[in-house]
């Protein structure tokens, strides 16, 4: 008996051989031949080389996946729990054999597993971002209700400026310029001031407080600037010099008044007699003359009728 693997070989063999020869045509696909010899069963399987290579590759992938799974379990047991990053390749939830399915089906299943893992990682990240913020400290909360803060908010809410002495003069009805407001007033004489520092210095007049003392003559002063100018008397320091004459002065204000002598400037004018002066203090003393002219004492003159 002769085994022929192709149809052309079968026709050639039929013409060459006699009629007593049996011809069997066998397909090209692998077959399994079972033979019994001395009660021992031998199984021979003929497999295509490409199929064997695919099976070996699948087995290697399964071994790698098992090793990765084992390493992940060891890391979870040794370290604190954390959200793992999305894996680049995931084992499928069921066993698949390349001999049973196509490569396209395997790729589709792998892509579905990757999408599910990425969705789980995104949910974990969103849960971490939605955690509540840390609670505000008690001291920070009390600061918002402190008396200074409440007073400042109430002061600004009523139309006052944060820096009363720095604002411009307000414009009233008809374009008339009003005096800048003076929100700080003295509780003793009810005098009002634009700045709190000016009120603080004014109150020292009523209390008699003079905290600044000269170390040379033991003279005391209400303001530190006055003490600074006083010390120049002992040191003989006169840092301000006139550009018109060789005179020197201890205070800048004294120099400014002296320069008006050379320039002839007299900015202070009396509203009654229109006389002008270089200094405001000289004008104030001049106004007292007009006030004293209006002060009189009624004197009754005796007449002859009164005597009779």
From Swiss-Prot:
This entry's Gene Ontology molecular function terms read: DNA-binding transcription factor activity, RNA polymerase II-specific; RNA polymerase II transcription regulatory region sequence-specific DNA binding; zinc ion binding
ZnF bounds (C2H2-type): 184-206, 212-234, 240-262, 268-290
Regarding tissue, the record states: Found in all tissues examined including the ovary and the fat body.
Localisation? Nucleus
Which Pfam families does the UniProt entry name for this protein?
zf-C2H2 (PF00096)
Biased-composition ranges, Low complexity, are 56-76
Name of the protein in question: Adult enhancer factor 1
Ranges where the record places region Disordered: 50-94, 123-143
What ranges does the record list as Pro residues composition bias?
Answer: 81-90
Give the UniProt entry's GO cellular component terms: nucleus
The entry's keywords: DNA-binding, Metal-binding, Nucleus, Repeat, Repressor, Transcription, Transcription regulation, Zinc, Zinc-finger
Residue ranges that the Swiss-Prot or TrEMBL entry lists as coiled coil = none
Species source reads: Drosophila melanogaster
Which purpose does this protein serve, as stated in its record? Answer: Transcriptional repressor that binds specifically to fat body-specific enhancers, namely the adult ADH enhancer (AAE) and the enhancer that controls yolk protein gene expression.
